[in-house]
Amino acid sequence: MGVTRVCALTLVGIGLFAGCGAPPPPAAPATPLATSGATCAGTVRTAPAGAREVDDAALLKAALADPGQGKLCTGKVFEATAPIQVYRVWTAAKATTEIGGWWSFDRPTGPATKYRQANAICPEWSTLDTLSTCTIKVGARFVVGPGQSADCADSVHYAASPENQVYVPNDTRAGKVYVEGCQKLGAWP
């Protein structure tokens, strides 16, 4: 083997080896798209104080729905780095619904019909008669985004909403609760 050929192979080897030495830069969290190509009425608000954006495709998928099905139109996943206060309007006759999945960062105001329309909440899903507040636990993941449209019983339809909602994957039946320090604030509105 000639000197030129050995030098060339050595340089190629060094170049390939050097390319493997540096780890790739961390990937930015994926920017979620609207489901089914639907146009969302709003955008995802910035991370709330006490949260950082994370990538969790399974949780995001659980919070999104196609048009007419409620849930979120688009969203981003966050992880609580400090307790974060959230509010929930629910049905008092169904006590198990107090620790549900859908919350708000802002204290809800009435009237109930306006709140229902702004958040695309079908009447058969909740009577919206009781208000509670809790804090999202440190380390818990949640999704934030604008509401998807909802087709309800009796031909009631709510359009997609720019109002950001908070999805916390609570499941009290399975013992999975990601909120704490809950207080029932009473009848609503």
Q: Where are the regions that the model predicts?
A:
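Conserved NAD+-utilizing ADP-ribose enzyme module
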Residues: 22-72, 97-98, 109-189
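Secreted/periplasmic proteins that engage bacterial cell-wall peptidoglycan
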Residues: 75-113
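Bacterial N-terminal signal peptides that target proteins for export
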Residues: 1-9
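C-terminal motif of bacterial Sec signal peptides marking the signal peptidase cleavage site
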Residues: 16-19
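Alpha-helical transmembrane segments
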Residues: 10-14
